[in-house]
Amino acid sequence: MKWQGRAILLPGIPLWLIMLGSIVFITAFLMFIIVGTYSRRVNVSGEVTTWPRAVNIYSGVQGFVVRQFVHEGQLIKKGDPVYLIDISKSTRNGIVTDNHRRDIENQLVRVDNIISRLEESKKITLDTLEKQRLQYTDAFRRSSDIIQRAEEGIKIMKNNMENYRYYQSKGLINKDQLTNQVALYYQQQNNLLSLSGQNEQNALQITTLESQIQTQAADFDNRIYQMELQRLELQKELVNTDVEGEIIIRALSDGKVDSLSVTVGQMVNTGDSLLQVIPENIENYYLILWVPNDAVPYISAGDKVNIRYEAFPSEKFGQFSATVKTISRTPASTQEMLTYKGAPQNTPGASVPWYKVIATPEKQIIRYDEKYLPLENGMKAESTLFLEKRRIYQWMLSPFYDMKHSATGPIND
C-alpha cells in the first residue's frame, strides 16, 4: 500500500533546553529532599472527660430496688442516699432478717432488764452494807467513849483500893471491908475487859463491812460489765442483720444526677450500673488520649495536636487544636483503661503498652449555625500527634539504616 500523504518533520528540541530543564528539575528535587522536612505523625483514639470525672455508681449487692431518693438533674452531696435495695430472703416462717431482728431485739430487752435489776440490786446491797457500817461505826464510837470513862473510873477505884489497904494497916477498917473493895475493883476490871472486847469486835466488823462494800461493788460492776458486753455483741449482730436486710446506696461525691439506670421494683445484680453523677460546675473539658509506646518518647507537655471529634465530623467542622498537658510515664493498667469507653482494647497475644496523655482543647464550646454546641463527657475523638521531625532525605534513607542495623555485628561498649 503506497503512502498517500506528505510527512512534516518538526524541528527537534534543542539540547541545551533539555539539559537546562533537567538541571532545574534535579536541582529543585535535591533542594526539596535536602532542605524540606517532614514530621512523623500517628493517629490515636481518646475521649472527652472532665476533672473530676463523671462518677458511675454500681450495685455491690443483688436485690430489689424498693425506694428511690433522687431524680435526674437533682443536685446531691456526698453521703446523700440514692437508692434503698432490699436483699432479704423469705421462708415459710416469714422474712428471715425480720425474724432474726425481732429475736435480737427481744434479747436486748431482756439484757437491759437484767442490767437494770443488777444496778438496782447493787444500790440496795451497797446501801444496806453502808447502813450497817454506819451503825457499827456509831456503836464503836459510843463503846470507845464508855471504855475511856470506865478506865478513868478504874483508876479511881484502884486509888480507893490502895487507900483501903492503908486504912486497914492503920486499923481504921477491918479486913472484910478491904476484901470487898478489892473484889469490886477486879469486877470492874473484868467489865472493862468485856467492853474492850466488844469495842474490838465493832472495829473488826467495820473493817469487814468496808471490805464487803468494795467486794460487792466490784462483783456487781463485773456482772453489769459482762451484760453490757453481751448487749454490745447483740447490737453488732443487729447491725449485721440490717446489712442483710436492706442496703442504702449513697452518693460518693458532690454533683448532679445525670442519669438513673434503674427504677423502683427492678431487680439489680452485683456490678449493675445504678446512676451517673457529673460535677456540678464544669470549668474545663479534657481529652484523654491513649498513645502507644513507640510514640510517647517524642511527645512533651505543650505540644500541639489536631483533634477530630466523632460527634463533629471533620468534613463539616474541620479539625480542632489542643495542647498536651500531662503525659504518664508508666503504662496504664488494664483496670484503669476499662473505666474509659474510648480506650483501645488489647487482643489476646498482642498486648501493647498504652500511655495516658491528657490534652486541653482550645475550644470548649463549638459554634455552628448560630448555635453553641458544648463538649460532653465520653465523646469519642481521634487525635493526630506530631512526633519526630527529619529531613526528607533522611526518611528516604531510613530503609538503608534498617539494613545497616541488620548487618551490624555485636556491639562492644
Swiss-Prot record:
- Tell me where in or outside the cell this protein is found: Cell inner membrane
Signal peptide coordinates: none
Q: Which UniProt keywords apply?
A: Bacteriocin transport, Cell inner membrane, Cell membrane, Membrane, Plasmid, Protein transport, Transmembrane, Transmembrane helix, Transport
One GO CC term of this entry?
plasma membrane
Gene Ontology process terms (BP): bacteriocin transport; protein secretion; transmembrane transport
Where, in residue ranges, is this chain on the Periplasmic side? 37-413
Q: Where is this chain primarily localised?
A: membrane
Bilayer topology annotation: Single-pass membrane protein
Q: Which domain of life is it from?
A: Bacteria
User: Where are the bilayer-spanning segments?
Assistant: 21-36
Q: Does the keyword Cell inner membrane apply?
A: yes
Q: Where, in residue ranges, is this chain on the Cytoplasmic side?
A: 1-20
Stored InterPro entries: CusB-like_dom_1, MFP, Secretion_HlyD_CS
According to its UniProt entry, what is the function of this protein?
Involved, in conjunction with CvaB, in the secretion of colicin V.
Task: Describe the family membership recorded for this protein in Swiss-Prot or TrEMBL.
Answer: Belongs to the membrane fusion protein (MFP) (TC 8.A.1) family.
Official protein name in the record: Colicin V secretion protein CvaA
Which gene codes for it? cvaA
